[in-house]
């Protein structure tokens, strides 16, 4: 945005008024396209034709008429007809132009009254012809209405650097101190983004031992470049391999290339329902999905297709209400099933990686394996009802590969998934299978899944860590009602090669009473060991001024814990928040020792970051703590302190003019500093972000080139 002061002349307004009046004085013309018009007769002569004086013996073909035609409520313009034997005739070519289905071998003029179920309203005085025809004798184009959008805002990039930080410190009553900092350093320009994260910690002893034990570890360092038009991101450095529901991701140091759908967030990747209908007359269309209106609009006569992205998951019902110009309504019913695991037909999602396995992540900074590993993942939408998957990974002495598929059963029969994978490691082979089925609607849900491994099944991660689960099964179901709330039960069984089999059964219930009060309860039962059984009951109440009160009771075989929490979060626009918590534990175990603890905390959220501090006590012991989060950015010739940045941001420049108010999405976000700069955050990456200024709040002598971008 460029702003500059400009001296306005006194004659500006009269000159603008003169231009405006000159524009108003220009007359407008209207052109009408004729259908097969080959005559010089003007409209006045057409209106003066006297059909009563017409003698059919004088003209074998009949009298030529050019009538203003309306077909099924839509204007078709001036069209050539014959008037003979007190009837209207038209050539096959004319009828085809209007949209009628006419036999190809018919060359003779066709009597309009011979067309089945055609309603004819001919006004000789006005020279108009109104036709209403059934759709089965018309060949009209399908009208497509869509609420989907494939907008691709042009992303822009600038050069700069960013530092995100999260610092935490604590001290106990005996002077034991600890300090930790998580940092992310990011450098960026048109060539990509270079990012590095690290975790630094320091601890001191108690009493006279004031020595600090310091430790710092690098977490991830990578360079990435994205290509939004191709939906591809290239990443080099520390990467995480792509994984499917039946595979495990692995940390590598190397190169990754693959699909990144977040580069086009307006694009939908899952199959979206289409609704088809017909309208004899111009009509209004309303679409309801599960009782909620999703679309309303108008369609002309003829077949139409409505494409939309309804906001629901699982099974649902849709109603399409078509109301024509005469007020007559027709309702069409559809069964739907929305499946986010499916890809649209002919859409691919892929990723390939090459590198060495990262070991001791979070402990050592540069600990990598010696063997090269490679992996590849591909998902493909074979149709809107079936998506195929495959995954392959190899390293020295190991190969692993498998295939899978996701099916939508019928129109609303639920989702079925199955996979089969095999591996070979040091001459030993193994197999892994998985399958699951799920179905849900707005009230009921059901799920069943199983995974198992046979033989010596291994993947790349097994070479440096634990093996995948050898067996797991899960079954769950739930139901929701307005009067009784949501409730359900589930059963889980997991077996690891190094551990005993674990079996759990659980049940839950929750209900909201209006907008302020909600209750919930959850029971977990360990089938293998009753000592791990637990019952959790909680209540949450929303009070005035954004204050919330919650209380809970958790009971196990050894103790019962009571907790009450009263809090007010800091506003997103900035301000002070606080939290107070009290906890009391009744111990019924061997030591039979009860305890009481509590927390008091204050936090502040401002334009430059967020800080919080608190005191925690447990019995006679207490500790204090504090933390700070934020970011420092250098870009566009300025240095800025702001809240932590995890998405897009921009620097607004007003050519050195200070105190210019700036808005984001029509909400005030701040004013420019003494250099005419303002950092605007957060922005939605690869989406439309409306940044602007309010010209009504600016001095009258400022010339504005642009008020929003």
For the regions a protein language model found, what residue spans apply to each?
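Low-complexity, Pro/Ser/Thr- and charge-rich linker/hinge segments at domain boundaries
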Residues: 139-158, 330-363, 548-551, 636-653
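Feature captures outer-membrane beta-barrel proteins of Gram-negative bacteria and organelles
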Residues: 153-154, 179-191, 212-228, 368-384, ...
């Amino acid at each position: 945005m460029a702003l500059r002061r400009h001296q306005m002349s006194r004659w500006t307004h009269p000159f603008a008024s003169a231009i405006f009046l000159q524009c108003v004085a220009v007359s407008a013309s209207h052109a009408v396209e004729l259908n097969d018009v080959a005559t010089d007769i003007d409209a006045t002569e057409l209106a003066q034709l006297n059909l009563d004086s017409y003698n059919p013996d004088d003209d074998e073909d009949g009298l030529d008429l050019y009538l203003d035609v309306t077909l099924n409520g839509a204007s078709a313009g001036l069209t050539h007809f014959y008037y003979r034997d007190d009837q209207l005739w038209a050539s096959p070519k004319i009828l085809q132009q209007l949209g009628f289905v006419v036999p190809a071998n018919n060359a003779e003029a066709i009597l309009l009254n011979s067309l089945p179920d055609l309603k004819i309203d001919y006004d000789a005085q006005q020279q108009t012809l109104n036709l209403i025809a059934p759709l089965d004798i018309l060949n009209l184009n399908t009208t497509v209405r869509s609420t989907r959008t494939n907008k691709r805002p042009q992303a822009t990039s600038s050069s700069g650097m960013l530092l995100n930080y999260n610092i935490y410190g604590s001290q106990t009553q005996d002077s034991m101190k600890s300090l930790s900092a998580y940092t992310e350093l990011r450098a960026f320009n048109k060539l990509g983004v270079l990012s590095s994260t690290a975790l630094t910690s320091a601890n001191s002893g108690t009493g006279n031992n004031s020595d600090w034990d310091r430790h710092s570890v690098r977490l991830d360092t990578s360079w990435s470049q994205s290509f939004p038009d191709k939906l591809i991101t290239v990443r080099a450095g520390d990467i995480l391999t792509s994984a499917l529901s039946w595979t495990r991701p692995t940390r590598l140091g190397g190169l990754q290339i693959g699909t990144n759908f977040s580069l086009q967030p307006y694009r939908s990747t899952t199959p979206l329902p289409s609704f088809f209908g017909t309208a004899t007359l111009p009509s209004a269309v309303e679409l309801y999905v599960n009782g909620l209106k999703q679309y309303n609009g108008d369609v002309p006569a003829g077949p139409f297709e409505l494409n939309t992205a309804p906001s629901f998951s699982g099974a649902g019902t849709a109603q399409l209400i078509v109301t024509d110009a005469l007020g007559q309504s027709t309702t069409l019913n559809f069964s739907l099933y929305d499946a986010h695991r499916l890809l649209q037909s002919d859409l691919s999602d892929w990723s390939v990686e090459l590198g060495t396995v990262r070991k001791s992540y979070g402990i050592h900074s540069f600990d990598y394996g010696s063997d090269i590993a490679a992996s590849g993942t591909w998902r493909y939408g074979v149709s809107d009802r079936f998506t195929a998957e495959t995954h392959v990974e190899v390293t020295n002495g190991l190969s692993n590969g498998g295939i899978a598929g996701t099916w939508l059963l019928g129109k609303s029969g639920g989702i079925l998934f199955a996979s089969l994978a095999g591996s070979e490691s040091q001459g030993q082979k193994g197999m892994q299978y998985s399958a699951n089925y799920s179905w849900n609607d707005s009230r009921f849900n059901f799920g069943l899944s199983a995974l198992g491994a046979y033989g010596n099944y291994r993947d790349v991660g097994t070479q440096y860590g634990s093996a995948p689960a050898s067996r797991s099964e899960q079954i769950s179901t739930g139901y929701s009602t307005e009067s009784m709330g949501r409730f359900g039960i589930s059963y889980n069984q997991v077996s690891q090669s190094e551990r005993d089999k674990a079996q759990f059964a659980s049940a839950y219930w929750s209900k909201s009473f209006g907008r302020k009060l909600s209750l919930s309860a959850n029971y977990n039962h360990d089938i293998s060991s009753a000592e791990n059984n637990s019952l959790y009951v909680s209540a949450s109440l929303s009070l005035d001024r954004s204050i919330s009160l919650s209380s809970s009771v958790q009971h196990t075989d050894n103790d019962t814990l009571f907790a009450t929490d009263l809090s007010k979060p800091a506003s997103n626009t900035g301000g002070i928040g606080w939290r107070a918590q009290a906890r009391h534990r009744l111990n019924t175990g061997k030591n039979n020792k009860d305890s009481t603890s509590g927390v008091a905390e204050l936090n502040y959220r401002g334009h430059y970051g967020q800080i919080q501090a608190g005191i925690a006590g447990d019995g006679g012991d207490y500790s204090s703590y504090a933390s700070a989060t934020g970011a420092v950015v250098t870009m566009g010739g300025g240095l800025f302190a702001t809240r932590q940045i995890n998405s897009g941001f921009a620097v607004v420049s007003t050519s050195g003019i200070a105190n210019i108010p700036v808005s984001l999405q029509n909400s005030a976000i701040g004013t420019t500093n003494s250099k005419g700069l303002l950092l605007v955050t957060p922005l939605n990456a690869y989406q439309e972000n409306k940044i602007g200024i309010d010209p009504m709040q600016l001095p009258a002598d400022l010339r504005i080139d642009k008020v929003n971008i």
